[in-house]
Amino acid sequence: MKALILSTATGGGHNTAAHAVLEALTERGVECRFEDCVAFGGQKLSATVSNVYVKFVQAAPDAFGRLYRFAKAISTPRIKSPVYLFNAAYARKMEQLLTDYAPDLIVCTHMFGGQSVTYLRRHDLWNGLFAMVMTDYTIHPFIEDIECDVMFTCKAAMPSARRLALPKSAYEFTGIPVSLSCRPCTDKRAAKEAVGLDPERPEVVLVGGSMGAGNLPEMIARILPVLGENGHLTVVCGSNVDALRRATEAYGSDPRVSLRAQVTPLTPLIAAA
């Protein structure tokens, strides 16, 4: 059996989930291939889409929130969205790969790939099994565009899922895929030593995701009073340079706080917490 995993780099979570799916399928003997779906429209397009999205979310989160709510308000299963048309525009460029690789299954961890594959199926250009993996804790706008065989999501998304024009049998409430390495830590002391932390100190890890989402300085301020003098806090700001700068200005001199940018892989640090 062959599987094609489609994702894109608008934030790191989609790719992380995609690689978790790839890892799990490979362990079960499935031949897998990973591709950036937007890159079928060109590497420059993929880089531009990713950079614009990440910078917009980081620089203007309130504006992004308003845009998101507007998109949710106009999202409908009755007509395809402008976002679908964007992703349909480069979908036919996947044909050669589908012919050469001939996957039995396509798994998408981003709406963009899901919309492209939907276009291919609607035009009889590919007819294998199609699975959509939601990497958010909600059903986001324009997901109605996607016509998949099964959609994997989390239980928190059940209320949102009910408004979609998909049969209940199409949902699997499994949660967001994680790497096989994300297992309960059995030796905290060794885990702390492995990432250079003091094994004698209680450790808290604050992660803002790959984009450094949320008000990290404010979260640090809330955690420190309950951390105690012996505790230690590691803050991962991801690619959010501004969040790292503000946190450094406010807490860089506090010996209880360590500030990091992007951490790859993140699992060993989480295991130490």
Spell out what each predicted region is.
Residues M1-L4:
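Extreme N-terminal starter segment of soluble prokaryotic enzymes
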Residues M134, G175, A261-V263:
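Short loop/edge segments at beta-strand edges and connector loops
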Residues A20-E95:
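Conserved N-terminal ligand/cofactor-binding loop architecture of enzyme catalytic domains
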Residues K188-A190, L197-A272:
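Donor-nucleotide binding loops and adjacent catalytic segments primarily
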Residues D149-M211, N240-D242:
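A nucleotide-sugar donor-handling region in carbohydrate enzymes
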Residues L6-T8, E35, V133, L206-V207, ...:
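Short hydrophobic segments within beta-strands
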Residues G12, A17, R69-F173:
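Active-site and donor-binding regions of nucleotide-sugar-utilizing enzymes
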Residues L25-V30, R122-N127, L166, P225-N230, ...:
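Short helix-capping segments at alpha-helix termini
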